[in-house]
Structure formats: structure tokens, C-alpha cells
Curated annotation (Swiss-Prot):
It comes from Chlamydia abortus (strain DSM 27085 / S26/3). Transmembrane segments: none annotated. Keywords: Ribonucleoprotein, Ribosomal protein. This is Small ribosomal subunit protein uS9. Pfam families: Ribosomal_S9. Gene3D superfamilies: 3.30.230.10. The gene is rpsI. One of its GO terms (molecular function) is structural constituent of ribosome. Residues 114-133 have a biased composition (Basic residues). Residues 97-133 are annotated as: Disordered. GO terms for biological process: translation. Belongs to the universal ribosomal protein uS9 family. The lineage of its organism: Bacteria, Pseudomonadati, Chlamydiota, Chlamydiia, Chlamydiales.
Amino acid sequence: MVKNTIEESVATGRRKQAVSSVRLRPGTGKIDVNGKAFDEYFPLEIQRVTILSPLKVLGYSNDFDLVIRINGGGIQGQVIATRLGLARALLKKNVDSKQELKSHGFLTRDPRKKERKKYGHKKARKSFQFSKR
């Protein structure tokens, strides 16, 4: 199954303000997110598919139990942060899977952040309404 003998691996993923800690251990596929069931915390199918895509690519669909802790951010930021954390945890378990995960873009952290508001502007780039007269 898995080449490395580490029993449990923990990894962190980030996206914008969302920070996700993923604890990966051998099991039957049970997923716990902030004390709730996976389907309850992420009700949309696309969110669940996005998070579990690193497991599916490597062929570990129901081989691991996941305990996920998420803080901050919006739903989509939390989804991408959790996917990154899961991919990093899988990489700790099986170092040989790095090329596979990297080719699908699961190990790349999205560096984009919210741009700060500038003085003299309404938002980061939006100006106040201009009146010619």
C-alpha cells in the first residue's frame, strides 16, 4: 500500500486567509472537519471532489482517515487550503508520489492575497466618483 512506514502524517495548507491542518492516518475513509461530518461541513459535491482529488489521483480512495482543522477564510479558500494540506500529508507518507502530485498542481500554493486599500481610494484600486464640475 504505502512505502513509508510513518503511521500518521500532519501537514498544513494555506490559501488567502484560510489555514487548514490535515491529519492523515491509515483507516477506512472516515473524514472529520472541525468536529463535523465531511458532507455536513462541505455540502457541495464539487467541494468534496476538489478536496479528495489528491487521494483519487494516487488511488488511495478509502485507505486513510482524515482529521481536518480549518480556520479563517471563505469556503473556496478553505477547500483549496485543505487540498494543499492533504497533498502535503500524502507526500510525507509516500515520497515517490511527488512527481504525480506536482504534475496535477496539488503541491503549488496559490500566492495571491487580498490587496490592501490605498488612501485616496474607495478600495484597493477603485477611486471615488470623479465630478468634472
